[in-house]
Amino acid sequence: MQKYLEKANVLIEALPYIRKFNSKIILIKYGGSAMENEELKHCVMQDIALLKLVGLKPIIVHGGGKDISAMCEKLGVKSEFKNGLRVSDKATTEVASMVLNHINKNLVHSLQNLGVKAIGLCGKDGALLECVKKDENLAFVGTIQKVNSKILEELLEKDFLPIIAPIGMDENFNTYNINADDVACAIAKALRAEKLAFLTDTAGLYEDFNDKNSLISKISLEQAKILAPKIEGGMHVKLKSCIDACENGVKKVHILDGRVKHSLLLEFFTDEGIGTLVG
């Protein structure tokens, strides 16, 4: 009997959060181990399907860096990185577009199998993501200039769940590879999303990444600004994205461990949460 009561308590605990976030837009940046491990991938898809079915409005932005690197190697296309960003010449950009499109359609298929009206897009569709060249040394790597969010608003209104590949275009219709974190942040700002969640390969934000007991469960925007200069590497970039989002209309940003099964549900629908809440 006790185990049944525990299950009931879990549902009751989720109720106020389901009510609070009903009809709210939730941006999810999907990447890392949660994309590479089939069991974790299925858990993420289940979480997102449940978010949708209880009345939230999720949007997924996905990456695909490791798959792009693997395909470049398989096809003999040279792939190099500068300052953590892939140098994207025309050949590399074509490979990236192909791989990201394949990932995108697989995600659409996975969610449709769970009863969700999912639709796959890239930033070129409907001129969703207009960009310019980020750096001449990076070739076709883009910086987003404008998000034409009307198409996403119309899809959400028609009960679709958009899944977006991080590919954009410039005014001359050239194709650009864009950092998926940047895409998620830009779209969240354009739609003034209730939440932006990053699925990562870390438990969250730490005061000291060498001290696993220093995990920060919640941090205000002002505290995040103070902490940001003290953090190095990829998490510094991610924290800057969190700050940018919170300063531009996104209410809360979450840094979650995508290696933990059902981390999205644990963060959004429980009192304690999991990972780090910014804002």
From Swiss-Prot:
Cystine residue pairs: none
Pathway recorded for this protein: Amino-acid biosynthesis; L-arginine biosynthesis; N(2)-acetyl-L-ornithine from L-glutamate: step 2/4
Site (Transition state stabilizer): 29, 238
Pfam families noted in UniProt: AA_kinase
InterPro entries according to UniProt: AceGlu_kinase-like_sf, AcgluKinase_fam, ArgB, Asp/Glu/Uridylate_kinase, Glu/AcGlu_kinase, NAGK-C
Residues where substrate binds: 64-65, 86, 177
Keyword Transcription attached: no
GO cellular component: cytoplasm
Record-level Gene Ontology MF annotations: acetylglutamate kinase activity; ATP binding
CDD domains: AAK_NAGK-C
Keywords from the UniProt entry: Amino-acid biosynthesis, Arginine biosynthesis, ATP-binding, Cytoplasm, Kinase, Nucleotide-binding, Transferase
Gene Ontology annotations of biological process type: arginine biosynthetic process via ornithine; L-arginine biosynthetic process
Gene3D superfamilies with a match to the protein in the record: Acetylglutamate kinase-like
Top-rank taxon, per record: Bacteria
Reactions the enzyme catalyzes: N-acetyl-L-glutamate + ATP = N-acetyl-L-glutamyl 5-phosphate + ADP
Function of the molecule: Catalyzes the ATP-dependent phosphorylation of N-acetyl-L-glutamate.
Matching NCBIfam families: argB
Homology family: Belongs to the acetylglutamate kinase family. ArgB subfamily.
Protein name according to UniProt: Acetylglutamate kinase
Organism annotation: Campylobacter jejuni (strain RM1221)
